[in-house]
Amino acid sequence: MTAKPQLPERTPRVKGEPTALDGLLVVDFTRVVAGPACTQTLADFGAEVIKIENPDGGDDTRHYEHAEIGGESAAFLSLNRNKRGIALDFNNPAALEVARELIAKADVVVENFSGGIMKKFGLDYASVAATNPKLIYCSISAYGRKGEFALRPGFDPITQAESGFMSLNGFPDGEPVRTGPPIVDMATGMSACNAILLALIARDRLGRGQQVEVALIDTAMSMIGFYGMAYLISGANPGRIGNSPNGSPTVGVFQASDGPLYMACANDRLYRRLVVDVLDRPDLVTDPEFAHRKNRTANKEKLRAIIAGIFASDSLEHWMAKMKKANIPVGYLRTVEEGFNAPEVRDRHRLSRIPHPTAGAVPNIETPLQMSLTPTVDPVAAPLLGEHTREVLRKTLGYDERRIAALAEAGAFGKPGNTA
């Protein structure tokens, strides 16, 4: 039984170090996963990200039930670090005017509402581009902003299912399985971030902004990768293969006498080292049934049974030590708990704790991106709902206290009088 990780305080960055996106203003209308994942990366590297939420409950992920701390959900905390949060009721004309003023000042707008919502409120690209011609306007959706399916709602598992992505996940004798983590959402967020950065580079060269669009269905199809390319070339419909690509007898999960491991020996060189140096079975090299990759594939069930029987004869640590000595690609098959406590993770210093206004401190999982000259900003926990409304209106838009109070009284931030 492993222990809950002991999270250290996050080591501050060196004072005076530059950030990659310093001075970039991002107005963030996104919620749930793909959009917030995109804007969090921008915020991590120094962009000023202003997250706009509905005052009536805010981002859906605030109410996800995986876990909570200090009244905040794990999902929301994991996707909204380093942002400033404001609450605006779009049904209030005064709130819409605030949103338009923020867009007019922004370098980047990111939104992932259902089709037609931003247009309904006059906040779509066509409505705002004239007032800010250098604006990068990124729309994230399930099926795109144009075409027959533009108004159709959809989420990560729907696009996993409809793209064919889910059909490849699972075992041949079982049903298609969605991934546990929302992989299409996360990859769409990464793609949107890439697209925004490309558009910013183009703006520096061309002097004007543009509309950027990323759709979950497109991301899911691109992630099918060489399986999709193989289908287009051969016409053969790929199916589920479990843990071994093409049923390879030397790739996948194997059971030692006391636990599982995952091994990947996909070529002749690695196979020779495996059977000679690890399994002490040189006959599995000279036997013509197994001498080359094609032969091993043709006789995969027989070979896999032989290898599985050998692995079952000794302990996990015995085999891990031998395979690491032979430089065989192998890993422990861990739970999340085991993975987050593993030495490989501790060595990367990816986990820490950071201050939070209601919880005292919350866990922090660092971005996977590391840069030597422009590292990430010191992380700030995800905002409370509307936490920075007054601050943003005052510092970013130059509103005085009287104007802010009038907006609050008019219900621009939700119920009259509501403001941070």
Predicted regions: what is each one?
Residues 1-205, 384, 390-420:
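N-terminal helix-loop segment corresponding to the beta1-alpha1 unit
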Residues 56, 143-144, 216-221, 258-260, ...:
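Glycine-rich beta-alpha junction loops
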Residues 67, 76, 241-246, 251-252, ...:
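Short Gly/Pro-enriched turn/cap motifs at secondary-structure boundaries
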Residues 145, 173-183, 204-220, 239-246, ...:
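Conserved Rossmann-fold dehydrogenase catalytic segment
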Residues 189-209, 222-234, 276-281:
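Oxidoreductase and adenylate-handling cofactor-binding alpha/beta cores
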Residues 249-326, 330:
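Aromatic-enriched alpha-helical interface/lid elements that frame and gate functional surfaces
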Residues 325-377:
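A glycine-rich dinucleotide-binding beta-alpha-beta segment and adjacent secondary-structure elements
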Residues 362-401:
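C-terminal active-site "lid" helix and adjoining low-complexity regulatory extension at the edge
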